[in-house]
Each structure stands twice: as C-alpha cells, then as structure tokens.
A protein has these predicted regions:
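Aromatic-residue hotspot detector
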Residues: 59, 156, 272-274
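Non-catalytic scaffold segments within catalytic domains of secreted glycoside hydrolases
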Residues: 3-20, 29, 67-70, 88-114, ...
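N-terminal pre-domain/capping segments
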Residues: 2-63, 78
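Short, functionally important structural connectors and interaction interfaces within domains
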Residues: 24, 122, 189-191
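Substrate-binding cleft and catalytic face of glycoside hydrolase catalytic domains
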Residues: 34-52, 61-175, 238-243
Length: 279
C-alpha cells in the first residue's frame, strides 16, 4: 500500500471529516494527522448536538475536535451553523416576532463562530438550501421566520462579525447530477450577493454515484467558479451501490476510481485563489 501522505500530493488543503469518538482511536488519529491538513466536524458542531431543549449550548465534543486540529497544526472547518434538517426545540418554540427569532439565531451563530475564532478557517453557514428537484429554495423554520434572503443575512452577518477572517460558505449537493438544482443554487448565490450578504465561498458537496457521466464534475466546478469566490469541494464520496452498479462490481470500482481522479483534477484546474479545500 502506498503510504505517501495525501497532503504532500496536493498544493491545496486536503481535509477529512471526524466525529469526536474517533479521537480516542490511535490508528485513526495517526492516519488523519499524517494525510490531512483540514478537519471537519461531521456532527458535533450541528445544532442538534449543540443546542439543548432549554436553549443552552454544549461545546464539549466540538472543543475536543478543535483541540485535536490545533494541537496537530490542522485547519478546522465548521459544519454547519444552519441546516433545514435541524430545528431545535429551543428555536421552534420562540415567539412569532421576527426580532426575537433573529436575535436568537444571531446569538447562536455568534457563540459558535466566536468560540473558534482564529482556528476555524471557514464555516458552512447555511447548509443545503435548495430543494432536491431544483424548483427553488427549501422551506425551513429559518426561512419561514426570517425570509429566504433574510435568514441568510442574519446568519452570515453574525458570523462575519464574530470572525472577520473566516471564509463563510453555503453548501449543497447533487449539483453535478441535477442541472435544475445547480441552476437554482446559482440563482440563489446571485441573489445573496446582490443583497449584500457576506457570502465568502461556495461549497459543492460531492456525493456521487459511480455511473455519473464523465465531465459532470468539471462542468459543475467551472460554473460555480464563475462567481470568483473560493470553492470548497466537500463531503466527497462515490457510491457503487445505486443504479444496479453492483451487478458489475469490478467495473463500478474502476469508475469510482476514475471519478475520484476527475474530482481531484477538476479542483486542481481551478485558479489557485479559489482552491479553498478538497475534502
């Protein structure tokens, strides 16, 4: 097995996701420190873990992940501040006034981003905002209370104030395989930038099936790079399970290998200033 560190093969940050329980596994920690330069919290920085029912916050596991990154000279990436799938009870029961809800959301974002100021190189501020069918932005607790652009404004402005140096992202998936979703995502980005939302980067979750047509990743990254912002190729995995691919397992695995290579080549072809991280 080739043991060459992955981080030595790329001129840009190469990242890995982690859950706090893995930090007690010496084989995992050795592998992570040897091969990667960026660490993303897979779960313990999400609202469903951080926010208690009474509205208080817990940072124990996020702190452990941050300490691991700091002690090994790795960048920390915060994932994720606002996600439609996380609607904590403490937020859902707030009164209906916009001011009350905006204040609570800004307080949460400020607490999270401020706690890791100077260590977190970036944050997924709002995660997966577009409907799967590409028909437009998702309906969520946040958009219902504050409006589609409004909830971006509250969250991004609070994050920017809490850490002016951190790169602030929105992030979504299936952009390579669903042209309508990519188009809707790009329209939202245009709207946010026009409204003055301090969006600093674009996340492209890269959950792929091995039968994805060749060239789709490259076309997607090229389209997103047209905004001139840093690109985070995030959450990369290539499944060989869907679409009857297991009928030809060997062929699916060859295609899987090819897609990983295409993703790396497509990211490497971006202007250097737009290569935020490959994870």
């Amino acid at each position: 097995v080739d043991s060459t560190p992955l981080k030595s093969l790329a001129p840009f940050p190469v990242g890995v996701a982690v859950q706090a329980a893995q930090l007690s596994d010496p084989s995992w920690t050795s592998l992570a420190a040897s091969h990667f330069t960026q660490l993303t919290a897979e779960w313990e920085m999400k609202m469903e873990y951080v926010v208690h029912a009474d509205g208080s916050f817990r940072f124990d596991r996020a702190d452990a992940i941050a300490a691991f990154a700091r002690d090994r000279g790795m960048r920390l990436f915060g994932h994720t501040l606002v996600w439609y799938a996380n609607e904590p009870e403490a937020f859902a029961r707030l009164d209906e006034t916009r001011q009350s809800f905006a204040g609570a959301l800004a307080n949460y974002v400020t607490a999270m981003v401020g706690r890791y100021r100077g260590l977190a190189s970036g944050w997924d501020v709002i995660n997966e905002p577009i409907k799967d069918d590409g028909s437009g932005p998702r309906d969520s607790l946040w958009s219902r209370k504050l409006g589609q652009v409004g909830h971006f404004q509250v969250a991004f402005e609070a994050a920017r104030a809490a850490d002016p140096q951190s790169v602030l992202f929105t992030n979504d998936y299936h952009l390579e395989s669903k042209p309508a979703k990519l188009a809707s995502y790009m329209r939202l980005i245009e709207q946010l930038l026009s409204a003055g939302v301090p969006l600093g980067g674009i996340g492209c979750q890269t959950h792929l099936d091995a039968d994805l047509p060749a060239g789709a990743i490259s076309r997607t990254l090229k389209a997103l790079a047209g905004f001139g912002l840093p690109i985070h190729l995030s959450e990369l995995d290539v499944s060989v399970v869907g679409g009857g691919l297991l009928a030809d397992r060997a062929g699916a695995e060859r295609r899987q290998e090819a897609l990983y290579g295409e993703a790396m080549d497509a990211f490497a072809s971006l202007p250097q200033r737009q290569q935020f991280a490959f994870t």
